[in-house]
Amino acid sequence: MPLMFAPVERAMKVIKILADEKTKKHLENLGITIDSELRVLSSGASVIVLVKDTRLALDSGLASKIFVVQA
């Protein structure tokens, strides 16, 4: 499922990122890669996620390109 539809406060695992290489590299620098785990803290116009003890805000366009499953 796209990250923007992931349930709040559940551990999720990234399985696919549908973005260009520049965006994938940016996400990698933030700690979001295939097989990485994250937790959605809130969602709406932007999605707030917790990745390795760091909170990140992702706009809904980017969050729709990150696919996750429950970890």
Please identify what each model-predicted range represents.
Residues M1-A71:
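Compact, glycine-rich, soluble single-domain proteins
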